[in-house]
Amino acid sequence: PDKPRALTPEEFYRSGRKYKVLWLLHGTFGDHSDWVRKTNIEMYATERNLVVVMPSALNSSYANWDKFMMGFGMFDYLTEELMPLIYGWLPVSDKREDNYIAGLSMGGRGTIKFAVNHPDKFAAAAVLSAAPVDFSLMSPGNPNMMLDCANPRTLASIENAGGLEAYQNSCENVWAIIDKLAPTGKLPRLMFACGTEDTLIYENLQTFRKHCEEIGLDCHWFIKEGYRHEWRFWDLAIQDALDFFGLTERGGNPY
């Protein structure tokens, strides 16, 4: 948030206000700086009096890798370490209704994983350029790369989980978790965004969208013609996500 010029520093910094928070996740080969360098997220956050937290997660897929080096538990790190740390350091709200999560690509996958496994922590989630898939359809050599359990990246995740059956029954199987929670009303509000030229993701997202209709899960869909897996799309999508979250407060300074 940006201090309005009409307020003194003491009035602003000692107001006791607790701000809303967006937990914003990067994609593969990215880091905490991606969103600031490649979009206007700082301006969008300032306009809405929003605190944005952008952690670095390497290429972890936001998973716990207990056998990697000294152990790299990124799934637990966000909710068990980083969130309490930020709540203690910064003037932000820890209430569910004031916390949102979003991410792109690998970060979109992380977003839906955190949202459905910790539905008590987030009011809403925006999944950009990522799509849940039905793990029960996984098979070696599946023409759908996201369902090919022999794909090196997927295989590494399967082995990390302790085998295919363990992987299918883990927190990674967001499709199954959504099926379980959809009738309960406990899920955060969900948004999915994708460009029509982001071929693999878009096709899987269309399958998931049909499934949502079948199970009666109401989601917000942001689909843009002609866009691929690219930052121009994600800059547009995050603006739509902030509107979807209901962050309409106008704050800061217009110049």
Residue ranges with predicted function:
Residues 1-255:
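Non-catalytic cap/lid and distal C-terminal segments of serine-dependent acyl enzymes
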